[in-house]
Amino acid sequence: MKRFITYVVTSLFAFNFGVSASALWPWSSYSTEKPASLPAVPLIPATPALTESNITAPVPQIVFGGGRLKLVSEEAQLKSQSLQYDIKVRYPHIVGANEPHIQRLNRRIEELVSEQYYGIQHPLKEDLRYYRQRWPEALSELFIDYVVTLATDSILSIYFNAYSYGIGAGTSVQYGFTVNYDLVSGKELKLSDFFQHRANYLAFISRYCTDQLATHKSGEWLHRENLAPVISNFDSWNITRTGIRFNFDEGEVFGCSEGEQAVEIPFAELKSLLSARGLSILRNSSVVGL
């Protein structure tokens, strides 16, 4: 994750579900003072912001893993007036198998999501005292939803989109984080797993993303330093059916008003750089272009 935000709040969040869901979901009730025991898109063009009055249907279930596994949505709705926070998160949970690596993945997802709101639930005493004096009715807010970019027998790739706003801040903040998992080996994937050891793949990714984003209507103001060929600039990525998508948070490559951005590099463009292992993982997933 490119950034970790401790006190952030928003009154809106947006997401896009690959096949059908560009939606938020209805909230029925909140927990009160005591939080639940949870551990807890990128779009081209940028995601339009939605208000809670626009919230519609939940994300549909996804069946994968040869029909054996199912992704269902779990929700956490946490609110405390005394601690001045309002948290709404949704994340995927795998059902249909009890294998240790599936259970580890479920825990990993829950913990990753819960890490995002731990700081909001546990404000410093001096900060809370200040909030109560200056903004007694205000709430820190965090909204998180997810996009599944690929779910096959061998790969699960998930993008989490977060909108947050901190008490006293002038505007909300968008940021994203990802999980890319090899269901065959039972391990989380790193970007380097797909490329030849000596291949200068970061230089290629940097150049490709820079060229694509430079054609944007705000290309003149592209933050090129954030596209330099270093791994930290490309640590938010997902596998899709047709390529590897690189996600850039709001304000990372353009001004904040342009929203979050993403660039997908087709597998055909990457093929000469891919390692034997990378090719094997991708071909087992029946992706297009290899």
How would you label these PLM feature ranges?
Residues 1-4:
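Positively charged n-region of N-terminal signal peptides that target proteins for export
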Residues 18-290:
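Compositionally biased intrinsically disordered regions enriched in Thr/Gly
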Residues 12-13, 17:
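Hydrophobic core
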